[in-house]
A protein has these predicted regions:
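Membrane-embedded transmembrane helical bundles of large multi-pass transporters/channels
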Residues: 1-57, 122, 149-367
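Solvent-exposed, non-transmembrane loop/terminal regulatory segments of multi-pass membrane proteins
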Residues: 23, 51-90, 94-96, 181
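Extracytoplasmic
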Residues: 71-72, 98-146, 163, 186-189
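Structural beta->alpha junctions
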Residues: 93-104, 145-153, 178-182
Length: 367
């Protein structure tokens, strides 16, 4: 059986004692490569199945103070006024050729009402009422669709209904759904588009900076491995958590930012330290020693950094707002997964690559 305690290849190390706890973790990872790789593969694949649903399942709502008078008043409106609260959906029907109470306008209003009645998330439906939701010339009216579900579910209802409602428009009658639920639905879509666009722009730039920083293409790819592992695991976890408690879409936004930032920082610490240790102790036995030294030094700094971030963010969980708690929770999840990947997956990859970490090095770079 192979010992997990590496011995320095020469007396140049100046270290007479064995590796510390993190150093032993690093050598244990090297001795159990298949197990560690298998666990991470199962984790990423298992959670990755749910990750694509993150933008649809998570909600942009939740900007409220639980227990406040405003939330209590909204709940009373939902209970006693047929769901006619802030999360209700309003459908504006406007006719360019006469009243919405007769002719084609009335037909469209009836179609809007029928479509809303088929959705179980909609409570009481109120057609355009004179003096309230009907203009003086009767050319424009508002169909009120009360909220029959919580705010997050009403955002999903708005997402499902808005295209069907808009499709009821004719050449002379225009149908436009609106309200806070529609606002958050549109925001989620704009947020997804902006996030994808920003990632397409930032990742190539990030890779170029990493290549310059590490001096080699292979070494530059390691932070991206940590980032992807943390992102996929975080996204899948958020979707699963959302089945138990509502999670805001902001959680994924901040999780992505922190996963990228910490993935780069943590990988930079470990890769630079490992390359220095291997340069000081070349040879086959130097791999285990370099991993142990890297984990006992840079690994310790990374662990303390991650724990500090987690402790700092835990205070945000006390804020009585679902959105703020979701943001803190998303960041904490990304930190946990990136930290776990840094302390287990990265040592495995470093030991496996060894000198190949400098492959495709820049001509002017130095290890």
């Amino acid at each position: 059986m192979t010992s997990t305690a590496p011995h320095p290849p020469s007396t140049r190390s100046g270290v007479a004692h064995g590796p510390g706890p993190l150093g032993r973790l690093g050598t244990w990872v090297l001795d159990h490569r298949r197990l560690v790789a298998g666990v991470w593969a199962l984790l990423i694949v298992g959670l990755g199945i749910f990750a694509p649903r993150v933008e649809h399942d998570l909600s942009g709502a939740g900007w409220q103070a639980d227990g406040s008078d405003s939330v209590a008043a909204r709940d009373l409106a939902v209970e006693h006024f047929g769901g006619n609260a802030s999360s209700a959906i309003q459908v504006v029907v406007r006719s360019s050729e006469g009243s919405v109470l007769e002719g084609e306008g009335a037909e469209v209003v009836a179609e809007v009402t029928a479509l809303l009645e088929d959705d179980p998330r909609i409570a009481t439906i109120v057609p355009p009422q004179p003096g309230a939701t009907l203009s003086q010339d009767t050319d424009t009216g508002v169909v009120l669709a009360g909220a029959g579900a919580d705010t997050n579910e009403m955002v999903r209802a708005a997402t499902d209904l808005k295209e069907e409602l808009a499709a009821l428009s004719t050449d002379t009658v225009e149908v436009t759904p609106t309200g806070s639920s529609l606002l958050w639905s549109d925001f989620n879509e704009a947020n997804l588009e902006a996030m994808l666009k920003s990632e397409l722009m930032s990742w190539p730039v990030t890779l170029a900076i990493l290549v310059l920083a590490f001096g080699a293409l292979v070494a530059a790819g390691l932070p991206l491995i940590l980032t992807l592992a943390g992102l996929v695991a975080s996204a899948g976890s958020l979707v699963l958590i959302n089945q138990l408690v509502p999670v805001s879409i902001w959680a994924m936004n901040f999780a992505m930012m922190f996963a990228l930032a910490l993935g780069i920082d943590y990988a930079l610490f470990l890769v630079v330290r490992y390359r220095a240790a291997r340069a000081a102790h070349p040879g086959p036995e130097g791999v285990r020693w370099a991993v142990a030294q890297t984990m006992d030094t840079a690994g310790k700094a990374v662990l303390l950094s991650g724990l500090t971030v987690l402790i700092s963010l835990s205070a945000v969980m006390l804020v009585p707002s679902p959105s703020f708690r979701s943001m803190a929770g998303g960041i904490m999840l990304s930190v946990v997964f990136v930290l776990g990947a840094t302390l287990t997956l990265l040592p495995l990859v470093l030991g496996w690559l060894d000198d190949r970490i400098n492959k495709f090095a820049l001509p002017w770079s130095r290890s």
